[in-house]
């Protein structure tokens, strides 16, 4: 067997394997003889059908089967011979079985990039720090109060703190636009949930009244097509309702599963810490890996990007179904996820290379600690979580990879130039 590797553009490779034609002929003869011993043909006893007759009837299928068997039997050795490791299953691109002396096939594939990781000491990374203040805790408690706040309709003019029920329609140049209309829309005055001027225009209005507001969308509005546009809102006031806040007592605390207010405040603080730790961890990890990715430029296998994009599309569809959502109108192409897929694949290759270079491995103790961290964050039974992962090799591997990923982060932070930026709880939640 002779194997020759052609280096194409980027990570693309083409491998041609040459074999004696006798190997192909012997393989086809063997398959033909097997078929001849099994098939029934008119005019012939079973098992007595001439091979020539079988070849005429099944020749193309036999050749295809023979080629597949030869490729399966020889490809691994051929790849070893040329020292190539495909990223995914090689694809047959050419077959030559007509030559009198040789049979050859060509497969195309991508290889993994050769990665020489950049010096960590050259990286500059910003990490976020957040301190939870008493004011943050009070805001969270106020949010719980709002959940249990009741509203009673009144016949007076509206004030800050009142909840209004309105119908509205927005017009730009006399025409409506997406999201411009709503019926029985609830808005609490003073929350700042609408564009500037909207809530202000609803102060001192009475039930069953109508008004028009001429406003301008902010230049940094999240919908670009509306940014900076002048808009007229036609508004009907259906109801003005006075808030009745709940008392902060034992009854209030029990509605949130705690015995009293002291226990509720402790629970709030713990939940805020879990939330902020998760958010900071996510942002700081991204900052580390963004710096790592920027410092290491190399080709990323397109086949891996395509596979990851398909995975991301599948995850999105599953999330929509789990949340009770309806399928999107029209199929979303996997290519819509290419940028994120490329990022994930590249970082996966970098983490793997760093792990290999530094001989990193996750101990059982580290894996169990990570499982406990996950179970505590989700408020679930720790032992059940650990048992479920230990019984599923795929799940256990995912935890092992998370542990190694964290080890890589720590390794980078230990050597990089790291700066810290203090932020407020509200800024990152």
UniProtKB/Swiss-Prot annotation:
The terms describing its cellular component in GO are:
cytoplasm
Q: Which HAMAP family does the record match to this protein?
A: Trigger_factor_Tig (MF_00303)
Pfam families cross-referenced by the UniProt entry: FKBP_C (PF00254), Trigger_C (PF05698), Trigger_N (PF05697)
Taxonomic superkingdom: Bacteria
The task this protein performs is described as: Involved in protein export. Acts as a chaperone by maintaining the newly synthesized protein in an open conformation. Functions as a peptidyl-prolyl cis-trans isomerase.
UniProt note: domains? Consists of 3 domains; the N-terminus binds the ribosome, the middle domain has PPIase activity, while the C-terminus has intrinsic chaperone activity on its own.
What protein name does the entry list?
Trigger factor
Keyword entries, A-Z: Cell cycle, Cell division, Chaperone, Cytoplasm, Isomerase, Rotamase
GO terms for molecular function, please? peptidyl-prolyl cis-trans isomerase activity; protein folding chaperone; ribosome binding
Q: Which residues form the PPIase FKBP-type domain?
A: 161-246
Into which family does the record put it?
Belongs to the FKBP-type PPIase family. Tig subfamily.
Q: Which InterPro entries does the UniProt entry name for this protein?
A: PPIase_dom_sf, PPIase_FKBP_dom, Trig_fac, Trigger_fac_C, Trigger_fac_C_sf, Trigger_fac_ribosome-bd_bac, Trigger_fac_ribosome-bd_sf, Trigger_fact/SurA_dom_sf
Which cysteines link up through disulfide bonds? Answer: none
GO BP terms: namely: 'de novo' cotranslational protein folding; cell division; chaperone-mediated protein folding; protein transport; protein unfolding
Fetch the Gene3D superfamilies from UniProt: 3.10.50.40, Trigger factor ribosome-binding domain, Trigger factor, C-terminal domain
Give the E.C. number(s): 5.2.1.8
Q: Where in the cell is it found?
A: Cytoplasm
Q: Which reaction does it catalyse?
A: [protein]-peptidylproline (omega=180) = [protein]-peptidylproline (omega=0)
**What is the first-listed, main subcellular location in coarse terms?**
cytoplasm
Q: Please tell me which top-level EC class this enzyme sits in.
A: isomerase
The species is: Ruthia magnifica subsp. Calyptogena magnifica
